[in-house]
Amino acid sequence: MKISFKISIVLSLFSALLFTSGFYASNDSIQFIKTNWVENSEGVIIVNSHKELLAYYNVNLKKFSLGSREKIASDSTIGFANAIEKYDEEYFKNSSIIIAILEENSGSYRHKYDGYSVNKIGTLTVSIKTTCDSDYATCDMAGWHVIIETNKLDNIKETKLCKTGLHQ
């Protein structure tokens, strides 16, 4: 009885080590950028170079309205182009950025970054909590790009988005 209990504990610990390698929380620099909503666009990408960032920007500029914003409305944020100005070739020598693309069924929703984890088999999971500051939400669709600064990320095989809060 005691031996099988010990084996159970050892197997549980081994599983925890195999499937979770680090959880990186809100001490990372995070930017929440309100962009256009595009159906079936939700996901996570990793950007490891200035060239990759410019390619993403150029391919998706019109699709998500990723330009800069001179005037910022009370229900909006800076533009994506404004947000990425600081990420030059020097930044990417030792760092990466993670971009989480979110789809929401209300422009009233806001977000809290809960962190990301990378497991031993190379799956990166970003956790975002959706909130609403008021009792009522609008019925307009909204898109968001969440930019997360991190140390260099290599050997990532797959990315996942875990949304909590209003989506539970």
Model-derived regions: residue spans:
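N-terminal Sec-pathway targeting helices
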Residues: M1-S12
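Exposed, flexible binding/inhibitory loops of compact, secreted disulfide-stabilized domains
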Residues: K6-S8, L18-Q168
